[in-house]
């Protein structure tokens, strides 16, 4: 971590981050991870990449099956590969970062929470998305209140994180969502800077977002760090099979 720039116990930093989250639903902290640490993590991801599970789910913007009326009936698709928590070296840079209590408490204060726990999911507590040429993560809302991510490597072209902030929960949200999906509401969309080393806190439950199609031979790597206010949080077997292609050892689908 770049402790010269981000002192983890500095209340002015965490207070400013909390204010940005409350106002905009997103907080971007560039250069949070040092270049040396990013290089170490990228080397590990590249070595592990053959183990990643590729998926191409189809769903609507609310991450459910496309059915019903209006924007709930719009079918979108994703394509990406994912490395799971148990792929990574317990002594490696990325797992050490996720399992660091100082980082946990820094994130907790940035989110304005009294309590925060790491996920108990053996695959999804920490995972890395790998997006290659032609891959996309189309428009969607998250099912959780916040996502914590670290940008590791940018694609040659594309791979922008586009955010239509705070459009859910209003009386006309379906019309706004439809306009964004059509490309008719560019004034509502902004690109969040995700340069390597950036830590981003994001409330995707109310903000629709996407990753634009990847172009070129350099894949996009992003680490996702999973936390919850409740202890012992795990994902469903269905999600594990969809995202990681397997269940924990000894369990059958």
Label the model's feature ranges.
Residues 1-11, 18, 22, 32-106, ...:
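Non-heme Fe(II)-dependent double-stranded beta-helix
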Residues 27-33, 193:
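Short amphipathic
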Residues 34, 144, 157, 216-217:
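Short strand-connecting beta-turns/loops that link adjacent beta-strands
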Residues 45, 152, 227-229:
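Short beta-strand segments enriched in hydrophobic/aromatic residues
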Residues 48-51, 155, 230:
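Phosphate/oxyanion-binding loops and surfaces in catalytic or ligand/nucleic-acid-binding neighborhoods
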Residues 104-199:
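Catalytic core of non-heme Fe(II) oxygenases with the double-stranded beta-helix
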Residues 162-166, 171-253:
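Catalytic core of Fe(II)/2-oxoglutarate
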């Amino acid at each position: 971590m770049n402790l010269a720039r981000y002192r983890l116990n500095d209340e002015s930093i965490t207070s400013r981050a909390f204010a940005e989250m409350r106002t905009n639903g997103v907080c971007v902290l560039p250069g949070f991870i040092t270049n040396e640490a990013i290089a170490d993590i990228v080397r590990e991801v590249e070595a592990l990449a053959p183990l990643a599970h590729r998926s191409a789910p189809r769903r609507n913007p609310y991450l459910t099956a496309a059915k019903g009326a209006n924007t709930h009936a719009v079918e979108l698709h994703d394509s990406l590969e994912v490395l799971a928590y148990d792929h990574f070296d317990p002594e490696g840079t990325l797992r050490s970062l996720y399992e660091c209590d100082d980082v946990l408490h820094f994130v907790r204060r940035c989110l304005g929470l009294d309590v925060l726990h790491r996920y108990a999911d053996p695959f999804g507590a920490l995972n890395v998305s790998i997006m290659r040429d032609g891959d996309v993560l189309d428009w969607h809302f998250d099912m959780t209140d916040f996502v914590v991510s670290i940008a590791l490597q940018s694609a040659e072209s594309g791979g922008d994180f586009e955010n239509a902030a705070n459009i859910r929960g209003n009386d006309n949200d379906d019309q706004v969502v439809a306009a964004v999906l059509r490309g008719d509401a560019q004034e509502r969309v902004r690109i969040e800077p995700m340069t390597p080393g950036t830590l981003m806190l994001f409330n995707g439950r109310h903000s629709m977002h996407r990753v634009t199609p990847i172009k070129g031979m350099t894949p996009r790597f992003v680490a996702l760090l999973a936390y919850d206010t409740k202890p012992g949080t795990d994902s469903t077997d269905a999600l594990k099979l969809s995202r990681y292609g397997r269940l924990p050892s000894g369990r059958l689908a």
